[in-house]
Amino acid sequence: MRFKFPLMAIGLEVVMIVLFALFVQYETSVNTSRNPNETESAAMDVEKTMESYPFFQDVHIMVFAGFGFLMTFLWKYGFSGVGINLLIAALGLQWGTIIQGIFRSHGQKFLIEMKNMIHADFSTVTVLISFGAVLGKTSPVQMLIMTILEITVYAANEYLVFKILWASDTGESMTIHAFGAYFGLAVAGILYRSGLKEKHSNEESVYHSDLFAMIGSLFLWIFWPSFNSATADEAKKQYRAIVNTYFSLAASVVTAYACSSLLESRGKLNMVHIQNATLAGGVAVGTCADMEIPPYYAMIIGSIAGAVSVFGFKFLTPLFTTKLRIHDTCGVHNLHGLPGVIGGLAGIITVALEESDSTKTVSQAAALGSSIATALVGGLITGAILKIPFWAQPPDEDCYDDSVYWEVPERKEYDNHFHELLSTLH
């Protein structure tokens, strides 16, 4: 770890710098170099680009704060949850910028606009979702490799969906959420260890770790309308995406609370359900968020997604572990996979009702199938690569433990008092 990780991290960053030198330039660089007198035109381009900055800022907060804190629910893995999240996102946004730009420019130099940066953040979200499936069972070296491989596959599938099939997926329920979840599940299946079949002693949350994770959920919940509307190409579509996501999220919260109480003993609420299933409405409405659907349609989608997510955590996650040998640490299948599929199906139905030409409906269905199939194949290949012992995967007894890869402060006496106080509150 001492040499493998620094060498790989520095090597990858050097590669990124070289690729940026070869392919990337500011939006105004070409305009001013061709004609120095075209400063007004260049300024207008930048002004238009900057209109997207509030959306970029919201998405950026989701990536680094939302997903980061959501991963801190394990009581001895908080440093890695939020820290490796930062590492993945920082490397991923650079590689996402390059690989997506190369696809769209067909190998030529390309200009950086705010939309490029939003799409780069989107590409990192796929890896962060997959990270949730293998949380606590992989090394930082493995996550660097997975970041590069997954974003490459994601960019190829995204190009297929949007530039060849011409499907609609504004909030990317299919291309980000379903893709990221099933990619992660495929990797988790390959990396499955029978030694972790019985629940690990570190695979637990405590009162304060769940509170930190809930903060992450709130960041994601608040900014999700921006996520689903950031790449819409018209103001009216952005407006529809914001409104539909807003109400879909609200509906999923109410349904998630109700189903959690229904399924838990004595009607109590389960914090795992609340942290995750309350976000399912934002995932599920993404594909058709900008389409001309009434708000109640978005609320129905959100309600279904919230219920399905809770039932998934209660019944499917244990089934996946015991029967399919897929250990999904964060339950990404329930927050991103199933709601992503629901979003894809909702998009197919909406397009079928709106369009008289069946070609568009077929394209939507093909996009959903492509996203899942590409994710599974890419995940299986990536998992096989990550399984090579050289990448410093932690042994079973050291899983879900920060001290393997981090300098962790020793617990002081006041820490014990703090934990005792929390336990009394709990």
Curated annotation (Swiss-Prot):
This is Ammonium transporter Rh type A. Component of the ankyrin-1 complex, a multiprotein complex involved in the stability and shape of the erythrocyte membrane. Heterotrimer with RHCE (RHAG)2(RHCE), that transports ammonium and its related derivative methylammonium, in both neutral and ionic forms, across the erythrocyte membrane. The transport of NH4(+) is electrogenic and masks the NH3 transport. Also, may act as a CO2 channel. Moreover in erythrocyte, regulates RHD membrane expression and is associated with rhesus blood group antigen expression. Residues 1-4, 76-78, 192-210, 263-270, 314-331, 393-426 are cytoplasmic. GO terms for cellular component: membrane; plasma membrane. Homodimer. Heterotrimer; a RHCE monomer interacts with a RHAG homodimer. Component of the ankyrin-1 complex in the erythrocyte, composed of ANK1, RHCE, RHAG, SLC4A1, EPB42, GYPA, GYPB and AQP1. Interacts with GYPB (via the N-terminal); this interaction bridges the (RHAG)2(RHCE) heterotrimer with the SLC4A1 Band 3 I dimer complexed with GYPA. Glycosylated. InterPro entries: Ammonium/urea_transptr, NH4_transpt_AmtB-like_dom, RhesusRHD. It comes from the Eukaryota. One of its GO terms (biological process) is intracellular monoatomic ion homeostasis. The chain crosses the membrane at residues 5-25, 55-75, 79-99, 125-145, 146-166, 171-191, 211-231, 242-262, 271-288, 293-313, 332-352, 372-392. It is a multi-pass membrane protein. GO terms for molecular function: ammonium channel activity; carbon dioxide transmembrane transporter activity; leak channel activity; methylammonium transmembrane transporter activity. Belongs to the ammonium transporter (TC 2.A.49) family. Rh subfamily. It is found in: Membrane. Keywords: Ammonia transport, Glycoprotein, Membrane, Transmembrane, Transmembrane helix, Transport. Glycans are attached at N31, N37. It catalyses: methylamine(out) = methylamine(in); NH4(+)(in) = NH4(+)(out); CO2(out) = CO2(in). Residues 26-54, 100-124, 167-170, 232-241, 289-292, 353-371 are extracellular.
